[in-house]
């Protein structure tokens, strides 16, 4: 059985884009993250160690948005996905 964790509307200013003004002025980015996982162990134990920490996922995503600039949004999204996929249980 697979369950889903969805974080929506994570907001931060980033300096991503192909154009100079995007890197210079920055812009607001809104990130949604969907993770497929299995909640059964966490449901039985009521222990954060048995699930994915939503706050950690949000911090990872926002760190990418506010971090070094990417030209393409696709590259930013791939970096966020790569970070999330390193978490146990994903």
Predicted regions: what they are:
Residues 1-90:
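N-terminal, polar/charged subdomain of small-to-medium soluble alpha/beta proteins
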């Amino acid at each position: 059985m697979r369950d889903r964790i969805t974080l929506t509307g994570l907001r931060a200013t980033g300096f991503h884009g192909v154009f100079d003004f995007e890197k210079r002025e920055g812009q607001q980015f809104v990130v949604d993250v969907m993770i497929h996982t299995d909640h059964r162990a966490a449901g039985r134990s009521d222990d954060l160690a048995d699930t994915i920490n939503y706050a950690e996922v949000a911090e990872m995503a926002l760190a990418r948005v506010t971090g070094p600039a990417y030209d393409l949004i696709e590259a930013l999204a791939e970096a966020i996905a790569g970070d999330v996929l390193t978490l146990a249980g994903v």
